[in-house]
């Protein structure tokens, strides 16, 4: 049975130091080779924390493969808005604003990892994360936008986004 090591690394900037080195050193793998593979696989997520699985397929032959997960929703929102972090007072001092198009873009990236059955439901999850980060949506309180989604205000936008797939 293959051994699996799960770590959270900065996209494109994994290094042999902690948390990676100590986790994979005991497995007998070439740490530099693993780090290089991870950096190659995560370079598109530069500046974001990315979940990575290192699967040791054959410890004797030292063969492994890398599986890159999708960064947390909060990381995708920060990257989309170009902000360093969420608000320390989410209700009183918003740090950015997402458009519905941006919400749908993030929801499409994350939908396979969410429990949401539809793009609409996944978008509402993204909006919930935006709320906790102090990010408005369409210039409004995210809860208001979630109600508008329930009322069908953005149905045309969702239909267009689902056709594009």
Swiss-Prot record:
Q: Which family does it belong to?
A: Belongs to the universal ribosomal protein uL11 family.
SUPFAM superfamilies of this UniProt entry? Ribosomal L11/L12e N-terminal domain, Ribosomal protein L11, C-terminal domain
Query: How does the record describe its quaternary structure?
Result: Part of the ribosomal stalk of the 50S ribosomal subunit. Interacts with L10 and the large rRNA to form the base of the stalk. L10 forms an elongated spine to which L12 dimers bind in a sequential fashion forming a multimeric L10(L12)X complex.
Cellular component terms per the entry's GO annotation:
large ribosomal subunit
UniProt lists the gene as rpl11
Q: Which UniProt keywords apply?
A: Ribonucleoprotein, Ribosomal protein, RNA-binding, rRNA-binding
GO terms classed as biological process: translation
The name under which this protein is listed is Large ribosomal subunit protein uL11
**Domain of life where this protein originates:** Archaea
Q: Which GO terms describe its molecular function?
A: large ribosomal subunit rRNA binding; structural constituent of ribosome
Give me the segments passing through the membrane: none
- Role: Forms part of the ribosomal stalk which helps the ribosome interact with GTP-bound translation factors.
Fetch the Pfam families from UniProt.
Answer: Ribosomal_L11, Ribosomal_L11_N
């Amino acid at each position: 049975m293959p051994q699996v090591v799960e770590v959270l690394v900065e996209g494109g900037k994994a290094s042999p130091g902690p948390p990676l080195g100590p986790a994979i050193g005991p497995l007998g793998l070439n740490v530099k080779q693993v780090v290089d593979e991870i950096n190659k696989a995560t370079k598109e997520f530069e500046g974001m924390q990315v979940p990575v699985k290192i699967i040791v397929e054959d410890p004797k032959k030292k063969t492994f493969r890398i599986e890159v997960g999708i960064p947390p929703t909060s990381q995708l929102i920060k990257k989309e808005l170009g902000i360093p972090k969420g608000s320390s007072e989410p209700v009183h001092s918003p740090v950015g604003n997402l458009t519905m198009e941006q919400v749908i873009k993030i929801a499409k990236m994350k939908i396979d990892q969410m429990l949401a059955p539809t793009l609409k439901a996944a978008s509402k999850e993204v909006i919930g994360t935006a709320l906790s980060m102090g990010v408005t949506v369409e210039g409004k309180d995210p809860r208001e936008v979630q109600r508008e989604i329930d009322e069908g205000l953005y149905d045309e936008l969702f239909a267009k986004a689902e056709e594009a797939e």
